[in-house]
Amino acid sequence: MTEKGELDMRRFITIFKMDFSNLFKNPVLVGYNTAFAGLLILILGYLCGGDYADSNTAYQYYTVSLIIYGMLNGAMTASNCFMERDIKRANLRIIYSPAGGFSVYFSKMTASFLFNYILHSLLLVILCPLLHVSLGSNPVFFLLLMAPVEFASAALGIFFCCVFHCEETTSTLLSTVISLLCVLGGTFFSLDGMGSLMAFTTKISPVKWLNEAFFTLSCDNSLQYFWPVFITATVLSVLLTLGCVLFFRTEDYI
C-alpha cells in the first residue's frame, strides 16, 4: 500500500471509530435494536402461542422473522447515522478535509452494519437459550447469512439519503416500504393459508425469500437458500455502494 493509501486508511478508520462510538451512545437506537425487539418477540410469541401445536414454535417463528425485520430496519439506523442534523454538520467538515466525501458515507455504512449486526447477534445469544429457539445444527451459517443482509440494509439506507438528501423523507419511505414488504413476506403472520392468490402475492416480497432462507437453516438444517440469498445480498450491497458514489453530492450539505 502506498503512503497516500495508508494515510487515507488511517483517516477512514478515525472517522469510522467516531461513527461507531456515536451509534452506541444513542440510547434510542440501542434500545430499539435490543429491548424493544426482544419485548416484541416475547409478546407476539406469547400471544400467538395458542396458534401452534407447541408454544415454543411461536417463539421460534417470531424470533427468526422479527430478527429479519430488525435487520431490514437497519436501513433507518444508517439514515439516522448519515443525515441526523447534528451529525450532518460534522459530515460537512469531513467532506472538505483531506479524507473526502467517500469516507463520510462509507464509514457510516460500515459502522451501521457492525452496530446492527452486533446487537442482533447479542439478542439471539440471549433469547435462543431462554426461549428454546434453534438456529440450526450449525448456528454459524445463520449468523454468517445475517452479515450481507445487514450490510445491504445499511447500504440501502445510505443510498436513499444520497438520492433524497433528507433524513425525514428517507425514514418515511424506508419505513413504509420495509413494513409493506414484511407484511407481504409473512413477518408478523403467515399469509400462505389465505388462499392461492395471497400465497402468490407473498412471493413478490423479497422478505418471503429471506424468511425461507433463515427458516430452512434454523428448522430444516438446509443450505438450499443460503448461497442464493448470500450472493444476492452481497451483490446488492456492492450496487448500492456504487449508487452512493454516483448520487452523493457535496452541495447537498451546504
PLM feature spans:
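Membrane-interacting alpha-helical segments
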Residues: 10-13, 17-24, 28, 95, ...
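Hydrophobic alpha-helical transmembrane segments of multi-pass membrane transport proteins
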Residues: 59-127
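Alpha-helical transmembrane segments and their short interhelical loops
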Residues: 101, 107-182, 229-230, 241-242
